[in-house]
Amino acid sequence: MEFENIISAADKARILAEALPYIRRFSGSVAVIKYGGNAMTEPALKEGFARDVVLLKLVGIHPVIVHGGGPQINAMLEKVGKKGEFVQGMRVTDKETMDIVEMVLGGHVNKEIVSMINTYGGHAVGVSGRDDHFIKAKKLLVDTPEQNSVDIGQVGTVESIDTGLVKGLIERGCIPVVAPVGVGEKGEAFNINADLVAGKLAEELNAEKLLMMTNIAGVMDKTGNLLTKLTPKRIDGLIADGTLYGGMLPKIASAVEAAANGVKATHIIDGRLPNALLLEIFTDAGIGSMILGRGEDA
């Protein structure tokens, strides 16, 4: 039986009543959404995500999407006989891999997301950080337990973001969909972790919310319990004891920095849940883990 058919009229009314204060509160604000994980690969979740994004726009919130594409990149690398390598959660990116990353993110994933949102009545426009050179990047050197300043190829970090292109799209009533590729000072492309781009973009847009969609319920402790609120100090401890590692490291670092630099609320949420965005934004309980800025109490 379809989910919508088993919700009573009374439950629907309660859900709408609970959402109303949040709609009023967040109308006119920007929400930057890092889109990745299962929500990008499972057809039902992809469609649900697109509908949710359109609904956010309809109630006056300005969603800005920054997407990943790890599974799709891995699949293409496998087709050409290359194996993906990662260091501290970052993809090692030689010239051939960079060409594939840019082709997959800009040529396939971005267009698919744009098309899906537009199918459900939105006005999405896809952009890459190389368009108008609006995401300036510099080479990222990674520290590992064994060695500092490891060069992992054409992997960058955000040097600066010119938000004019994105703000212009928002003002035109569009939903920007951003592929996380930056441009270096010589015009070269850099693969940038989508979490880092989402965090920096949220800061520069003075976003009300930064929402990062993942394949887990949120940040978990060693016993598997969900941590609903985390301070930077607690996060430092979780990294030190090995609870947080790999792909969670750039996600957490980006969330902490965004919270410290004016983004009013940063959340790591479970993208496997239907309507995850709506559950976080429009319900009293919310879902996932909220990252607090320095000086805030959990």
From Swiss-Prot:
<dbReference type="GO" id="GO:0042450">
    <property type="term" value="P:arginine biosynthetic process via ornithine"/>
</dbReference>
<comment type="function">
    <text>Catalyzes the ATP-dependent phosphorylation of N-acetyl-L-glutamate.</text>
</comment>
<keyword id="KW-0418">Kinase</keyword>
<keyword id="KW-0028">Amino-acid biosynthesis</keyword>
<dbReference type="InterPro" id="IPR041727">
    <property type="entry name" value="NAGK-C"/>
</dbReference>
<comment type="similarity">
    <text>Belongs to the acetylglutamate kinase family. ArgB subfamily.</text>
</comment>
<comment type="pathway">
    <text>Amino-acid biosynthesis; L-arginine biosynthesis; N(2)-acetyl-L-ornithine from L-glutamate: step 2/4.</text>
</comment>
<dbReference type="InterPro" id="IPR001048">
    <property type="entry name" value="Asp/Glu/Uridylate_kinase"/>
</dbReference>
<feature type="site" description="Transition state stabilizer">
    <location>
        <position position="34"/>
    </location>
</feature>
<feature type="binding site">
    <location>
        <position position="191"/>
    </location>
    <ligand>
        <name>substrate</name>
    </ligand>
</feature>
<keyword id="KW-0067">ATP-binding</keyword>
<dbReference type="InterPro" id="IPR001057">
    <property type="entry name" value="Glu/AcGlu_kinase"/>
</dbReference>
<feature type="site" description="Transition state stabilizer">
    <location>
        <position position="251"/>
    </location>
</feature>
<dbReference type="InterPro" id="IPR036393">
    <property type="entry name" value="AceGlu_kinase-like_sf"/>
</dbReference>
<keyword id="KW-0055">Arginine biosynthesis</keyword>
<feature type="binding site">
    <location>
        <position position="91"/>
    </location>
    <ligand>
        <name>substrate</name>
    </ligand>
</feature>
<dbReference type="Pfam" id="PF00696">
    <property type="entry name" value="AA_kinase"/>
</dbReference>
<dbReference type="GO" id="GO:0005737">
    <property type="term" value="C:cytoplasm"/>
</dbReference>
<protein>
    <recommendedName>
        <fullName>Acetylglutamate kinase</fullName>
        <ecNumber>2.7.2.8</ecNumber>
    </recommendedName>
</protein>
<dbReference type="InterPro" id="IPR037528">
    <property type="entry name" value="ArgB"/>
</dbReference>
<dbReference type="GO" id="GO:0003991">
    <property type="term" value="F:acetylglutamate kinase activity"/>
</dbReference>
<dbReference type="GO" id="GO:0006526">
    <property type="term" value="P:L-arginine biosynthetic process"/>
</dbReference>
<feature type="binding site">
    <location>
        <begin position="69"/>
        <end position="70"/>
    </location>
    <ligand>
        <name>substrate</name>
    </ligand>
</feature>
<keyword id="KW-0963">Cytoplasm</keyword>
<dbReference type="GO" id="GO:0005524">
    <property type="term" value="F:ATP binding"/>
</dbReference>
<keyword id="KW-0808">Transferase</keyword>
<dbReference type="InterPro" id="IPR004662">
    <property type="entry name" value="AcgluKinase_fam"/>
</dbReference>
<keyword id="KW-0547">Nucleotide-binding</keyword>
